[in-house]
Amino acid sequence: MNTAIVALPPTLDPMFWIGPEGFFAAAMLPATLVIIFVETGLLFPLLPGESLLFTGGLLATKGTIDIWVLSPSVAVVAVLGDQIGYLIGRRIGPALFKKENSRFFKQHYVTESHAFFEKHGRWTIILARFLPFMRTFTPVIAGLSYMSYPLYLGFDIVGGILWGGGVTVAGYFLGNVPFVRQNLEKIILGILFVSLLPALIAAWHGYRSQSRTAKSELALPD
C-alpha cells in the first residue's frame, strides 16, 4: 500500500523564507537578537522568546544560523537588555505600579513579578528567565528593590547563559533527531503559530474592548 506524502506549497514552507537559501536567511540572526533585546529591555513581554530561540536552534541544523554564534550572541543581548530593565526600575519603577492597562501592558505583569521576586529573592533573576512575562519585568523589580547591582549582574549573566545558550542548544540537538529533522518544516510552522497566539489574543481583546467602549459612548444621550 502506497502512502502519499503531501508537500507544503513553496510559499508555505518556512524553509522557503528562512532556510539556508531562503529570502530572509541573512536576517535571521540580527532579527532574533533585536527581538530578544526588545523583549528583555524595552518591556514588551508578548514577543516569542523561548519559541524564537528554540526555532533558531532548529534552523541551525539546516545551516541557516551558526549555533556557536547564535547561542553566545543571544546570551549577551539578553543580559544587555536586562540592564536597561534594571535601570528603568531604578529610575521610574514605582510609576509602573500606577500605569494603566493597555493592549500590550497589564498591571498584573508587574505585581506578579514583584510577588515572585519577594518569594525567591536573588534566585528570581535566574528562574524568571524561563517564565514568560516575568523575565521582562524581573529586572525592573530588581532595580526598584535596589538589589545590589554587582550581585544582580552576576545572577543575570548566569541566567542569560542558561536561557540564551541552553534553549538554542536544546533546539539544535533536538533538530538532529531523525523524526524532527524529517518533519522540521511542519514543526517550525507549529511553533510559529503557537508563539504568535498571545499577541493575536491580546490584539483581539484590545479590539473588542475598544469596540465596546465606542458603542457605549455612542449610546450615551447628548
UniProtKB/Swiss-Prot annotation:
The chain crosses the membrane at residues 23-43, 67-87, 157-177, 187-207. It is a multi-pass membrane protein. Keywords: Cell membrane, Membrane, Transmembrane, Transmembrane helix. Its main location: membrane. Pfam families: VTT_dom (PF09335). PANTHER family: INNER MEMBRANE PROTEIN DEDA-RELATED, TRANSMEMBRANE PROTEIN. This is Uncharacterized membrane protein ML0287. It comes from Mycobacterium leprae (strain TN).
